[in-house]
């Protein structure tokens, strides 16, 4: 290879990342117009398009590099020099941390995820002490109640870039003040002030105002979801001021926000104060930088591994028929491998399973489906694998594993947030906790269905409970669109003997689902059955599901709320409008 080619390659990769992030910002910047025009289908399409941008631009750069090198192989020393040149380009680069991840992605695409070492990749950042340099403009603006909270909130809402009229701004301000007074107390409120992010955070059918509420006792989140009526008038739906509420809004089971962030590291640092329970990976994920979030997630895993003497074990819960799941006892994530062979009743391929996981990545997860990170050639130290798990890996997924002596390489796996399996949770709780869990499960099914997702396998074992008590779906191998399912009523038995027969007396075609059958496995436990019948009996009726299908086919996009219905101002303080979207 001619000298100087290393610098050209390094510059080509960085220019490719510039192009990718420029398009990322371009798609993001259209969020306001999509919201104002209530173009909800365009919102969904933009979300998918933005996710695809990264891999598309990695592919473009890889093709450029193959042209530059004329398809010739490059030795290790050459690649190390490329990385050295790339590193020298980053000290004054505003998005250096994501540029490092982009370099990693290009390398992995070129070399098929082989030879992934710290020398060749940015497994750890080249600038670990650096956060960000001078910010060209402030990320947020401060508002003080010098003339009272009514004036302060009027200034905040009037400063928003939204071009739609307000339905009743004064009313919304009264509601916000009422909430703050209830939360903080009338005496404390005059001694508080607010800092509000300059950019709105768009997701689904809401524009979120994200801020920090500084009180005499510390800093709290200040979140206002702004919705629009069918007539195009704005209203504030609620006010959230606890870290738990903010954590759910920015949760791992939700779609990524569309927020204009030319300096994502600066925004992540700003958000950290009101989301103290979120890791760096989770914060990058929330603002849509999912590939860099994967890098940060892997770094968090390596740091945990370095400080722990735990062994990998099979994850608690009922063993899956498609996925082999393992974890570290104290780690908050699980590792999922597609088995080489599935149980006989699972008539599908590994490619189908991967397609299901990709569907979830691109779809609106409505707070009910866990996000995943996908890895190839994942290396584990044999000394850190429990013998029982090692035997299970060799039994269930031998084709996915390469033995390198002291290590094994897993060809493909997913990493996902660890939750308590719902079936285990239900065994351990009683009273109100049991009731809440059943209510959450039914709500999860409803919200997934309204978002055009049918889980397929609705057994409790396929759902998990988060630390906030929310029920989230995490087993995707039978997932499909609601519009692909044929929901049927079970025909009446022809003879009394029909109901005792081992085979159904009616024909069943692929795609047929009989909701009446859900009752057999969801209500078998006498503690659970009556609660389910009380709260979710309509889930056992085919006409309920067909009505949802009709709404979806007619183009209706349901509202998705990241908070309880009882927290909405319309419920707490009075009706907003007969035309406002309802939950």
Curated annotation (Swiss-Prot):
It comes from the Bacteria. Pfam families: AceK_kinase, AceK_regulatory. InterPro entries: AceK_kinase, AceK_regulatory, Isocitrate_DH_AceK. GO terms for molecular function: [isocitrate dehydrogenase (NADP+)] kinase activity; AMP binding; ATP binding; phosphoprotein phosphatase activity; protein serine/threonine kinase activity. Its main location: cytoplasm. The keyword DNA-binding does not apply. GO terms for cellular component: cytoplasm. It is found in: Cytoplasm. The keyword Phosphoprotein does not apply. ATP binds at residues 315-321, 336. Its EC number is 2.7.11.5, 3.1.3.-. It catalyses: L-seryl-[isocitrate dehydrogenase] + ATP = O-phospho-L-seryl-[isocitrate dehydrogenase] + ADP + H(+). The active site is at residue 371. GO terms for biological process: glucose metabolic process; glyoxylate cycle; tricarboxylic acid cycle. Belongs to the AceK family. Bifunctional enzyme which can phosphorylate or dephosphorylate isocitrate dehydrogenase (IDH) on a specific serine residue. This is a regulatory mechanism which enables bacteria to bypass the Krebs cycle via the glyoxylate shunt in response to the source of carbon. When bacteria are grown on glucose, IDH is fully active and unphosphorylated, but when grown on acetate or ethanol, the activity of IDH declines drastically concomitant with its phosphorylation. This is Isocitrate dehydrogenase kinase/phosphatase. It comes from Salmonella paratyphi C (strain RKS4594). The gene is aceK.
